[in-house]
Amino acid sequence: QRWTHVIKSFRIPAHWKIWRGYDFGYSRPFSVGWYAADEDGRLYRIKELYGCTGTPNEGLKIDPVEQARRIREAEENDPMLKGRVIQGVADPAIFNESQGESIAQMQEKHTYYLVWHPGDHTRLAGKMQMHYRLAFDAEGRPMLQVFDTCKHFIRTIPNLVYDESNVEDIDSDQEDHIYDECRYVLMENPLSPRQIQKETA
């Protein structure tokens, strides 16, 4: 597990905290990522649900309630997640009530009962947390590792590039949905840069 970000899956200990990150999408993919935190604060992306047609950056066009059903189904059918307390953090936009019932309200009131709290959408701080997490320490261990079953994370994250008009940020016209939901979870578990001893190559 050293000097790598992608690792084989393993059974998550029962006492590890589980997070669920969510970026809503309709014509673009929605993204859900489940993360486990170990005793050292290291995060593992252990599972994902990506609402994509198979064509990059093309969403399934399914409504918020159907997305909630699929999220709940994924948790009920996974031994690592079934029966666990899971903290949900999502794009703050799903709490918008300006046009009626919010997406968060729709997903909470149905039998699938998904409860979210709004993630920190500060883009620069979130990008820095991603850098801190992916950096290797002196022993070759990053603070974010990804199970090799998370194919869409592995496909999309390395392809992200900076915004030409704002080089401090990622270009949001890309397939950045996994990046966004990951940021929300990372911002709930912030690292200090002084904990990082060696940058990634």
Name each model-derived stretch:
Residues 1-24:
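ATPase catalytic-site recognition across NTP-hydrolyzing enzymes
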Residues 26-28:
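Beta-propeller domains
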Residues 41-171, 190-201:
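Mg2+-dependent endonuclease catalytic cores in nucleic-acid-processing enzymes, primarily RNase H-like
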Residues 172-193:
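Acidic, Mg2+-coordinating catalytic module of metal-dependent nucleases/exonucleases
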